Amino acid sequence: MIGDLLKGFNASFGDLLTSTEAGQGTIKDNMDDLCDILEDEILKSKASEDEKKALLKKLRTFCNTETNIMLVGATGCGKSSTINALFAVSEECKDIEEEEYLEEDQPQKTYVEIAKVGSKADPETKDIEKYRIGNLILWDTPGLGDGTEIDEHHKEVITELLRKEDEEGKALIDLVLVILDGSTKDLGTSYKILNDVIIPELKNDTSRILVALNQADIAMKTGRHWDYEKNEPDEILIQFLEEKVQSIKNRIKEDSDLDISPVYYCAGYMEESGDVVHPYNLSKLLYYIMQSLPAQKRVAIMEGINTDSDHYEYNDEEENYNEEIKDSFYDSFDYISDGVDTGVEVGGTILGIPGAIIGGFLGGFVGCIKSILDSIF
């Protein structure tokens, strides 16, 4: 299968091929080229016309599918810092009207717009901010907990967005990332939106809900217990965080009878003293996001990630999350051939025949993608 081949591919050999048409570029640049080449390989293959149609349909779905993630949380929980830590949302992002960037001749760049969700929106209340990074779309909902009336408005726009459908009549939002403030005991507002809106609207589908506890570094009020040199919690803080995560899980179970396991992390920031707290467990959070999404939805995530390798350096040691992230991405390629019953060779890869991929432009682009990912993770 393609995923296994990508994992075993010799990236350094692929780099030798980049002197032709395959440049270093970005993950998205190389993915676009790789998709074009795979399409050409399918068309040139000895597969039947029906098999070609099936493969092409899945390939185009895989390469062009948008992924929509909604972020929900109380004011001050760190939604914006999480977005900036995880994804390539730069200060150069500009406001742009939706119809402008949907024109075919407009390049797929990173844009931010104010999404007018909710016809009864009060001009004094905040609207949902919508970030587009290629095929990745992030919906940053307004912070909760600033007053009953304002929260009711926010609940309405969140509900409306959760009910939106895509062109195929499927739910628009693929994943709801609920961010909790690890520095406070008062999580009532977040529990309320989770139990009153998110869980009911998603019809108890826990695969589309991810709960994350941010600001893990300041979770304890009695001393920081944060090792600045190692950029990690000490044993006392780890135990506290594990107990807090278990408490949150128990509370959600008690309220909804659903099993949702939160992940704790720190999005990173600079203190007034100049001390830098780098992101911690960001790779773990990204891995959980990848695993929560269907295979064909993961490409957009990788195309939109923040490529600063420092963000993924510090994690707990429960798993090698960086390798798991890459494997999850490579495994997603198997979506193209899953369910297509054919025995012919397509690009030397799609049906598990690894011969042709180590030659020609295809190998170069695969090598580029692997090299880029290896430099990040």
PLM-predicted stretches and their roles:
Residues 29, 362-377:
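Membrane-engaging insertion elements
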Residues 143-152, 233-234:
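Flexible beta-alpha connector loops of hexameric P-loop NTPases
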Residues 97-101, 105-112, 154-155, 225-236:
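Short, flexible helix-coil linker/hinge segments at the edges of structured domains or between repeats
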Residues 210, 219-354, 358-361, 365:
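C-terminal end of P-loop GTPase domains and the immediately downstream helical coupling element
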Residues 145-149, 185-188, 220-221, 271-275:
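A generic structural signal for short coil/turn motifs at secondary-structure boundaries
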Residues 73-75, 139-144, 178-181, 211-224, ...:
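Short loop/turn segments at strand-loop or loop-helix junctions that form parts
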Residues 156-258:
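Conserved C-terminal guanine-recognition region of P-loop GTPase G domains, centered on the G4
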